[in-house]
UniProtKB/Swiss-Prot annotation:
Family according to the record: Belongs to the ATPase A chain family.
Protein known as: ATP synthase subunit a
InterPro entries the record matches: ATP_synth_F0_asu, ATP_synth_F0_asu_AS, ATP_synth_F0_asu_bact/mt, F0_ATP_A_sf
Transmembrane segments: 17-37, 72-92, 99-119, 125-145, 170-190, 195-215
Keywords: ATP synthesis, CF(0), Hydrogen ion transport, Ion transport, Membrane, Mitochondrion, Mitochondrion inner membrane, Transmembrane, Transmembrane helix, Transport
Quaternary structure and partners: F-type ATPases have 2 components, CF(1) - the catalytic core - and CF(0) - the membrane proton channel. CF(1) has five subunits: alpha(3), beta(3), gamma(1), delta(1), epsilon(1). CF(0) has three main subunits: a, b and c.
Membrane topology field: Multi-pass membrane protein
Function description: Mitochondrial membrane ATP synthase (F(1)F(0) ATP synthase or Complex V) produces ATP from ADP in the presence of a proton gradient across the membrane which is generated by electron transport complexes of the respiratory chain. F-type ATPases consist of two structural domains, F(1) - containing the extramembraneous catalytic core and F(0) - containing the membrane proton channel, linked together by a central stalk and a peripheral stalk. During catalysis, ATP synthesis in the catalytic domain of F(1) is coupled via a rotary mechanism of the central stalk subunits to proton translocation.
Subcellular location: Mitochondrion inner membrane
Primary location group: mitochondrion
Cysteine pairs bridged by disulfides in the record: none
UniProt organism field: Drosophila sechellia (Fruit fly)
Gene Ontology MF annotations: proton-transporting ATP synthase activity, rotational mechanism
Length: 224
C-alpha cells in the first residue's frame, strides 16, 4: 500500500536516462515569448508580482545589501513556484517533492552565505552566536544552540518544501484511489473534495515558494 502511494514520486527512466527531471527546466521555454509577443494581462500581473517581491526583498536585505542581489531570490521564487504548479498537473513529475532538488537549492545558498559571512564579517558572525542580553552563565549553552540552529537551516528549508509537496499529493492520491469503489453519489462528493484540495494545493504551492525565498533572503541579510 505504501509503495503504491509513493510511486507517484518515483522518477521514471527511458533508455536509462531520468528524462522526467527535464520538467524542471520547462519554464525556460516560456522566457523567449516575453520578448517577441505583445505583453498580455498575465505578463503585466507577473511583472507586478516580481516588482513587489523586489521591493520586499530589498527591504529585508537592508541598506547593506548589494545592488541586484534580489534577483537571485526572485529567480529562486519563480523556479520553485513554477515546479510546484507543474506538479499539480496529471502525469507531470513533481521535482520539488524530492530532496535532491530542494537540498541542491538550499545547501549551496547557505554555504555561500556562511563562507561570505565568516570571511568578510568574522566578528559579526561571532556576535550572532550569543544573543544580546544573555547572562554569562548561559553563553556557552547559547553558542551551542545557535550553532546547531544555524547548521540545520538548509535541511529545514529543503524538508519544509518537500514535506508540503508530498503531503498534498498523497492526499490527492488517497482520494483518487478510493473513487472506483464508491457509488455515483459519493463520487460527486469525492470530486468536490478533490477540487477543493487542488485549490488548497495551489495556495500551498505559492506560499511555500514565497517562504523559501523569504527565508533565504533573511539568512542572507544576517551575514551582512
Amino acid at each position: 500500500m505504501m509503495t503504491n502511494l509513493f510511486s507517484v514520486f518515483d522518477p521514471s527512466a527511458i533508455f536509462n536516462l531520468s528524462l522526467n527531471w527535464l520538467s524542471t527546466f520547462l519554464g525556460i521555454l516560456m522566457i523567449p515569448s516575453i520578448y517577441w509577443l505583445m505583453p498580455s494581462r498575465y505578463n503585466i500581473v507577473w511583472n507586478s508580482i516580481l516588482l513587489t517581491l523586489h521591493k520586499e526583498f530589498k527591504t529585508l536585505l537592508g541598506p547593506s545589501g548589494h545592488n541586484g542581489s534580489t534577483f537571485i531570490f526572485i529567480s529562486l521564487f519563480s523556479l520553485i513556484l513554477f515546479n510546484n504548479f507543474m506538479g499539480l498537473f496529471p502525469y507531470i513529475f513533481t521535482s520539488t517533492s524530492h530532496l535532491t532538488l530542494t537540498l541542491s537549492l538550499a545547501l549551496p545558498l547557505w554555504l555561500c552565505f556562511m563562507m561570505y559571512g565568516w570571511i568578510n564579517h568574522t566578528q559579526h558572525m561571532f556576535a550572532h552566536l550569543v544573543p544580546q542580553g544573555t547572562p554569562a552563565v548561559l553563553m556557552p549553552f547559547m553558542v551551542c544552540i545557535e550553532t546547531i540552529s544555524n547548521i540545520i537551516r538548509p535541511g529545514t528549508l529543503a524538508v519544509r518544501l518537500t514535506a508540503n509537496m508530498i503531503a498534498g499529493h498523497l492526499l490527492l492520491t488517497l482520494l483518487g484511489n478510493t473513487g472506483p469503489s464508491m457509488s455515483y453519489l459519493l463520487v460527486t462528493f469525492l470530486l468536490t473534495a478533490q477540487i477543493a484540495l487542488l485549490v488548497l494545493e495551489s495556495a500551498v504551492a505559492m506560499i511555500q515558494s514565497y517562504v523559501f525565498a523569504v527565508l533565504s533572503t533573511l539568512y542572507s541579510s544576517e551575514v551582512n
